[in-house]
């Protein structure tokens, strides 16, 4: 079954896409925050990440087997002060994505010029921050993607107008990761 997720004033709305292309509303789920700006689904269709530009919040929700949106699993607010007073004087989460193995969630914040890295524990559903990529001031990290083999992270910026490439490696310990900028 195909499912469409949309941001709405009240949170997130899920729709089943019917064979004729029509949409059938499944449900609406509140995110306990301001309207999001970006949605991402994990590889196994188990989780939905909502990026909150206006309130600096990344919200993780469960997805039900029928495609409807389940309850909030966890959520984190970014804190800090940005580098451009006219626009980025506070956190603005622009992208949140889970790695394909569901171990990590990365959260890009163009307001404070950072990408925060969280370890995701499926057992208790918690996101625990383990690292931060501190980007160049006034660069505004906007979106990112991993390479299919997850060896590289491609980070795109809104203001800087470049793509940085990071080598992603894991150590032997659960929270031992390294994101080395190589380009």
Question: Residue spans of the language-model regions?
Answer:
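Residue-level detector of Asp-centered blade-edge/turn motifs that repeat once per structural unit
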Residues: 1, 43-45, 100-101, 148-150
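Short loop/turn segments immediately following the C-termini of beta-strands
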Residues: 9, 53, 63, 110-111, ...
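Structural signal for beta-propeller blades
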Residues: 12-14, 56-60, 113-115, 161-163
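Short loop/turn segments immediately following beta-strands, especially the blade-tip
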Residues: 15-21, 60-70, 119-126, 166-176
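Blade-edge beta-strand/turn elements of extracellular beta-propeller
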Residues: 23-28, 69-72, 78-82, 123-136, ...
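Asp-box/WD-like beta-propeller blade repeats and closely related beta-sheet repeat scaffolds
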Residues: 24-95
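Acidic, glycine-rich loop-and-beta core segments that form the ion-binding/anion-interacting portion
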Residues: 130-183
